[in-house]
């Protein structure tokens, strides 16, 4: 993982460790949005991984059907 991707992943790691267990599992996609974000950052680095994550979060809302959405 690039240094930029690592820094960007810190809030995601915090969410997964401390906030995620307290919240209901409501993600419409598989894998979950946080798992997708970590995979995108590891596979594509900080810039493209962040863009893919942002696009995924925009789609994770009640008007999108969700489904299986692997990291490209």
Swiss-Prot record:
Chief localization: membrane
GO cellular component: plasma membrane
Record's subcellular location: Cell inner membrane
Top-level taxon of the source organism: Bacteria
InterPro entries in the record: Membr_insert_effic_factor_YidD
Keywords: Cell inner membrane, Cell membrane, Membrane
Membrane topology term: Peripheral membrane protein
Claim: Cell inner membrane is one of the keywords in the record: yes
Cross-referenced HAMAP family: UPF0161_YidD
Function: Could be involved in insertion of integral membrane proteins into the membrane.
Family the entry assigns: Belongs to the UPF0161 family.
PANTHER family: MEMBRANE PROTEIN INSERTION EFFICIENCY FACTOR-RELATED (PTHR33383:SF1)
Listed name of the protein: Putative membrane protein insertion efficiency factor
Organism this protein belongs to: Myxococcus xanthus (strain DK1622)
């Amino acid at each position: 993982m690039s240094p930029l991707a690592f820094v960007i992943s810190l809030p995601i790691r915090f969410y997964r460790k401390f906030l995620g267990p307290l919240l209901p599992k409501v993600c419409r996609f598989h894998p979950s949005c946080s798992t997708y974000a970590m995979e995108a950052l590891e596979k594509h680095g900080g810039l493209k991984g962040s863009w893919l994550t942002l696009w995924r979060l925009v789609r994770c809302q009640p008007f999108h059907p969700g489904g299986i959405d692997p990291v490209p």
